[in-house]
A protein has these predicted regions:
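Sec-dependent bacterial lipoprotein signal peptides
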Residues: 1-22
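Short, low-complexity, disordered segments immediately C-terminal to signal peptides
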Residues: 25-44
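Beta-alpha junction/loop-to-helix N-cap segments that form part of ligand/metal-binding clefts
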Residues: 29-32, 46-47, 73-80, 92-172, ...
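Extracytoplasmic "Venus flytrap"
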Residues: 43-58, 62-83, 108-112, 135-136, ...
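Hydrophobic alpha-helical segments within soluble ligand-binding/sensing domains
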Residues: 115, 183-207, 246-249, 272, ...
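Extracytoplasmic ligand/sensor domains, especially the bilobed periplasmic-binding protein
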Residues: 128-239, 287-321
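Extracellular/periplasmic periplasmic-binding protein-like sensory domains
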Residues: 280-363, 432, 436-438
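Segments of small-molecule ligand-sensing domains
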Residues: 349-359, 370-429
Length: 440
């Protein structure tokens, strides 16, 4: 019963990242109440050059997200967690560079048109210094084009910092096309290569299949696995997936018929769950390797058919032994660790959401933003902020796993390229497999 209770509690909390109603986050000041911090003492750079969005008392940043939940995403939790962390920073630490951070957040309804429109408002009307934490590759594509070349003349010198985007498409690392865009989450090529390394080290004689979404996300995994697998002949099936049930089943059975004994899934959670259910019905049980974008708890809910304890346990039993990766502390497994206890205090004290995977992610990203601003105090301009971000080396957020670091440079805009391989257990916990793997 202890395992059942732990699994059920863990899953209910983790499911908040996929099924809870979105927590709306209004734009405007990150401080819902007056600051209790003492007036900050002068700091180096207080009187130095500064760009749009910077005054003697504040630094304005912008972010767009599906704040209303109209696209049925849980991502407003990220913005809410960032607001809470900045409020803590302003209240307890006096802000950064002697100024308070003011995050202006706009609802983009998780559409490219909405994201571009609200970003233009934040830049052209609200005059924010930089944008942070953009979500979704298709949603962010037109936004990135605008931020890297605002007037569309082909000259990127007048760009706006596009900091720590929350999409792992490898294309953001093209510093010629996107010189102002900085990644945050591990790029999908990195994750694919870490999974391929597991195949090389532990399943070296197994035939390999790949089922990937037919977009930039899936294409990165196809490329990454195919490039990193030592014995290319072992890749017997590589397919981009049509998610309709009939086509999905046919593609799964075609993968089975090639003799694939290990299958890499680069699919969103609902489609991945359908693959697991179809495979079980067909008696097909390869070793599964799953993109980190899939929450094990979300998969367990989808596979088991609900959130009741027995349904979740059924889902985790089907996932048992599957391989995935992680790079942040777990809101459940690491709940007693000092960084998670401090994270919980911040969320509870400063109006953040209930602690979950997305709040951990949000604070981790916010810490990287703050470190970037600290390094730009002598020149809080858009160019100064970009150069400060590019200077980050061996930066470890308090909520990153041990051994995971953020490393950037003028020619390297891939932030996190270290992942911890894990094996999903039947009680929903994650077993670390060796040390974190770094991929450059």
């Amino acid at each position: 019963m202890a395992i059942l209770h732990k699994c059920f509690y863990s899953s209910l909390i983790m499911l908040s990242i996929t099924v809870l109603g979105a927590v709306a986050c209004s734009g405007g000041d990150s401080e819902p109440g007056p600051s209790t911090a003492a007036t900050p003492s002068p700091v180096p750079g207080r009187g130095g050059p500064h760009g749009p969005g910077v005054t003697e008392t504040e630094i304005r940043l912008g972010m767009t997200n599906d704040l209303s939940g109209s696209a049925d995403t849980p991502y407003s939790l990220i913005t809410a967690a960032i607001h809470a962390y900045f409020h803590k920073l302003n209240t307890e630490d006096g802000g950064v560079c002697g100024r308070k951070i003011n995050l202006l957040a706009e609802d983009d309804h998780y559409t490219p048109q909405g994201a571009l429109q609200t970003t233009r408002k934040l830049i052209e009307q609200d005059q924010v210094l930089a944008m942070i934490g953009a979500l979704g590759t298709p949603v962010h594509t037109p936004v990135a084009a605008y931020l890297n070349d605002p007037n569309g003349d082909g000259n990127t010198a007048d760009g706006i910092p596009d900091l720590f985007v929350s999409t792992g498409w490898s294309g953001w690392g093209d510093v010629t096309k996107y010189p102002w865009t900085i990644g945050y989450i591990p790029d999908y090529l990195t994750d694919a290569r870490v999974l391929a390394r597991y195949l090389n080290d532990h399943l070296k004689d197994k035939k390999i299949g790949i089922l990937a979404q037919n977009d930039q996300f899936g294409n990165d995994y196809l490329r990454g696995v195919q490039e990193a697998v030592s014995n290319k002949e072992l890749v017997v099936s590589s397919q981009t997936v049509d998610p309709s049930p009939e086509s999905l089943k046919a593609q799964l059975l075609a993968t089975r018929d090639t003799g694939a004994e290990a299958v890499v899934l680069a699919l969103p959670p609902q489609v991945s769950a359908n693959i697991f259910k179809m495979a079980a019905a067909a008696g097909y049980s390869p070793k599964w390797l799953i993109s980190y974008v899939n929450s094990p708890s979300a998969l367990a809910r989808e596979i088991g058919g609900g959130t009741l304890a027995e349904q979740l346990l059924k889902g985790f039993e089907d996932l048992n032994g599957s391989i995935s990766t992680k790079y942040l502390l777990s809101a459940i497994d690491d709940a007693e660790a000092a960084p998670l206890q401090e994270h919980r205090r911040i969320m509870e004290t400063y109006g953040g959401p209930i602690v979950n995977t997305l709040t951990v992610y949000g604070q981790s990203l916010a810490e990287a933003v703050v470190e970037t601003l600290k390094r730009s105090c002598d020149s809080i301009t858009r160019e100064g902020v970009l150069h400060a971000a590019e200077s980050l080396q061996h930066f470890h957020s308090s909520l990153m796993l041990p051994g995971v670091e953020l490393n950037l440079g003028p020619k390297d805009h891939y932030a996190i390229q270290t992942l911890q391989p894990v094996e999903i257990q039947k009680d929903g916990t994650l077993k670390d497999l060796g040390d974190p793997v770094a991929v450059e």
